[in-house]
């Protein structure tokens, strides 16, 4: 026999971690992070308000890191698919293959793959980055939901049904999982 048959299960989407990618928080960012963690002791939902390019993403990354150390899943919601590309690059540089992306530009097979990773609480879906529809993934160990740009009107689903506001639905989902919600706004 000349050939042997092997079945290798590979993911269609994979992200690589950059070894030397480090985030150094400024004094203001570090204070903000500590304030958020303090407020999470009292409140399950908190608002982080900062102007565009003020460094909110770095604060999100450090907060996400703390929830991952507790072996929790994190959902990072964005208002538009177009914003995922830039954020995926930043998050995957830091978290590597723990990132999964879920939105309608992915084909059905890719979405089913992400769905299964989330369902199995796989290492490949510890941080799920997505738009409104990512709320409906089968999380089993959700610890944090970050709703970036929570003021955006695109979080409202008008057509087709069901009609919902993703920010409000995220808060309800977090309640079911006893998770925390961080709303980011500019």
Over which residues does each language-model region extend?
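Pre-Walker A segment
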Residues: 1-78
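Conserved motor-coupling elements within RecA-like helicase/translocase cores
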Residues: 90-98, 102-128, 136-142
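Helical mechanochemical/support elements of P-loop NTPase systems and associated helical scaffolds
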Residues: 28, 32, 44-47, 56-60, ...
């Amino acid at each position: 026999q000349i050939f042997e048959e092997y079945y290798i299960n590979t993911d269609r989407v994979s992200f690589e971690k950059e070894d030397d990618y480090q985030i150094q928080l400024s004094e203001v960012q570090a204070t903000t992070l500590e304030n958020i963690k303090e407020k999470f002791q009292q409140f399950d939902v908190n608002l982080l308000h900062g102007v565009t390019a003020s460094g909110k993403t770095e604060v999100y990354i450090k907060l996400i890191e703390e929830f991952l150390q507790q072996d929790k899943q994190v959902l990072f919601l964005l208002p538009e698919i177009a914003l995922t590309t830039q954020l995926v690059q930043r998050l995957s540089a830091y978290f590597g293959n723990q990132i999964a992306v879920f939105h309608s530009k992915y084909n059905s097979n890719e979405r089913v793959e992400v769905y299964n990773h989330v369902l199995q609480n796989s290492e490949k879906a510890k941080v799920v980055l997505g738009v409104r529809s990512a709320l409906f993934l089968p999380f089993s160990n959700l610890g944090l939901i970050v709703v970036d740009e929570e003021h955006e009107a695109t979080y409202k689903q008008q057509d087709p049904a069901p009609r919902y506001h993703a920010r409000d639905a995220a808060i309800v989902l977090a309640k079911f999982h006893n998770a925390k919600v961080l709303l980011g706004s500019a």
